[in-house]
């Protein structure tokens, strides 16, 4: 019964909860109140890297008129490694809803991160630029922008051209450093990726001034 389940779930681990609700889910897919209860339990227990949670969210986002479950679904797809599906849901949210500015900026950044994992680096950068147009001094956006450049470095031309991408990345990390919330991470990233800069001799033979 529901009362027994309510007594059990606070002490249950993720595996136990999935085991308890998986069969019930198969028989109760049209019971929206039941699905919302499962979603709440799994979310509160941080038990989101599993197929049950994805299945529950997939149904709820179809029947709920708000974007709440769609955002949860996109984030959960990302957490489970389904980056293309995650990108598609984030894209749909941005197209279909007039989001409040902070939420829109965060959704753009999450969309950019999904695109990064798909190796769609130029598209990912475009989304970070849109996020920064909303929040110009947002260190987290500059951090992600830098990490996108790092991720895509190996796909840029010859060895020299690949190393020059780290100039762009570190420039982003320097901008991120101005935001106290991410300052420590930004400084570590600067120290890590500055080591990959091309040396002066390499720059000279490639007709580029280091700076």
Model-based region annotation:
Residues 1-4, 11-17, 25-38, 49-53, ...:
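Generic helix N-cap/helix-start motif at coil->alpha-helix transitions
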Residues 1-3, 147-175, 198-205:
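Short coil/linker segments at helix-helix boundaries
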Residues 22-28, 57-66, 92-101, 130-135:
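Solenoid-like repeat scaffolds
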Residues 37-41, 73, 104, 110-111, ...:
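Structural register within alpha-helical repeat arrays
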Residues 46, 98-101, 113-119, 146, ...:
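Short coil/turn linking the two alpha-helices of tandem helical-hairpin repeats
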Residues 175-211:
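Terminal, low-structured helical/coil segments at or just beyond the last alpha-helical repeat
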């Amino acid at each position: 019964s529901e009362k027994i389940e309510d007594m059990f779930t606070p002490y249950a681990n993720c595996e136990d909860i999935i085991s308890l609700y998986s069969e019930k889910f198969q028989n109760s897919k049209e019971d929206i109140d039941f699905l919302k209860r499962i979603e709440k339990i799994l979310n509160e227990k941080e038990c989101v890297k599993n197929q049950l949670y994805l299945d529950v969210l997939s149904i709820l986002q179809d029947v709920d008129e708000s974007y709440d479950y769609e955002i949860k679904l996109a984030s959960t797809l990302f957490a489970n490694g389904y980056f293309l599906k995650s990108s598609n849901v984030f894209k749909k949210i941005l197209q279909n809803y007039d989001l409040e500015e902070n939420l829109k900026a965060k959704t753009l950044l999450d969309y950019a991160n999904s695109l990064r994992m798909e190796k769609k680096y130029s598209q990912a950068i475009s989304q970070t630029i849109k996020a920064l147009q909303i929040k110009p001094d947002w260190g987290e956006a500059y951090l992600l922008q830098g990490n996108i450049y790092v991720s895509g470095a190996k796909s840029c031309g010859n060895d020299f051209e690949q190393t020059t991408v780290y100039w762009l990345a570190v420039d982003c990390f320097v901008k991120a450093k101005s935001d106290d919330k991410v300052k420590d991470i930004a400084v570590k990233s600067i120290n890590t990726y500055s080591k990959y800069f091309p040396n002066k001799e390499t720059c000279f033979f490639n007709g580029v001034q280091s700076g």
